[in-house]
Regions:
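Solvent-exposed, non-transmembrane regions of integral membrane proteins
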Residues: 1-264
């Protein structure tokens, strides 16, 4: 194993899910039965939280400024993601324990805290653990010809479990001839669908097909179009996490003034 580039493909489903559950179970056990250990006490300290936030933001800043997304797959980045999730999980468990230990009823639980923190954990965790299952392939759909071969971004070929056939292609243009919009009528696994730019077809749960290009010189006479198959089976978990964060932010916005008024 290279120290920098992790073999991400090795951790595809179900291994990534098993590892995620094992890590979750281990952290819960440590918090319940080894709460006074040096490791747990550090993870619950303000220093651990500051380090987690700063390292995560620094990683995001480096990736955003350099544009090198492959950095996310490096060993240091993996350790930062694991550390961030671990600290966040311990903070959530401590917050939940404080709520239940005081005998708080369900309606009195700080849902703002739980929704925000659990939402971040779910969004980051699904992106991290689901990365090995994510993939993007390009297909050259040919007019009236069944195609099953696709290509990864590194140029290697792969076979998809269904056929794609280009049936028709249309280009709408401005008066000066500049393309305004283009769409392709494609047969996908026996089903005829219409693909437009930024209007993908959901072939299955977590798999979308996008129209990304065509023969610009031939226009509507193009004998092929370029499709991109994006596989992100964990994206719905990330969406749920984002919704939880939005709900937590709304509760924070609604409940904040009331809490301040009570203190006054």
């Amino acid at each position: 194993m290279d120290f920098i580039d992790m073999p991400v493909s090795f951790f595809t489903f179900p291994l990534n899910l098993i590892l995620a559950l094992l890590c979750l179970g281990l952290m819960v056990w440590l918090y319940k039965d080894r709460r006074k250990s040096v490791f747990v006490r550090f993870m619950l300290s303000p220093s651990a939280t500051i380090i987690a936030i700063c390292s995560f933001l620094l990683l995001a800043l480096i990736v955003g400024c350099t544009g090198k997304r492959e950095i996310v797959g490096s060993l240091p980045s993996v350790l930062i993601f694991l550390y961030f999730q671990t600290v966040l999980l311990f903070v959530i468990m401590r917050g939940w324990r404080h709520q239940t230990a005081t005998g708080a009823r369900l309606g009195a639980v700080r849902w703002r805290f739980l929704l925000n923190h659990a939402g971040i954990l779910l969004a980051v965790g699904s992106a991290f653990w689901g990365a090995p299952d994510s993939d993007a392939l390009r297909v050259r759909a040919i007019r009236d010809v069944a195609v099953k071969e696709a290509f990864h971004m590194d140029g290697t070929s792969s076979w998809i479990p269904y056929e794609i056939i280009l049936k028709d292609f249309k280009v709408d243009r401005y008066e000066d001839g500049t393309p305004l919009m283009y769409e392709a009528v494609v047969d996908v696994d026996g089903k005829e669908v219409i693909l437009r730019v930024n209007s993908p077809y959901s072939h299955s749960l977590g798999e979308d097909i996008y129209l990304v290009g065509y023969d610009s010189l031939a226009g509507e006479s193009s004998q092929y179009c370029i499709l991109e198959i994006v596989r992100e089976p964990w994206k719905y978990a990330a969406v749920i996490g984002i919704i939880m964060m939005i709900a937590g932010a709304l509760l924070l916005f609604i409940g904040g003034p009331a809490r301040r008024n009570e203190r006054e």
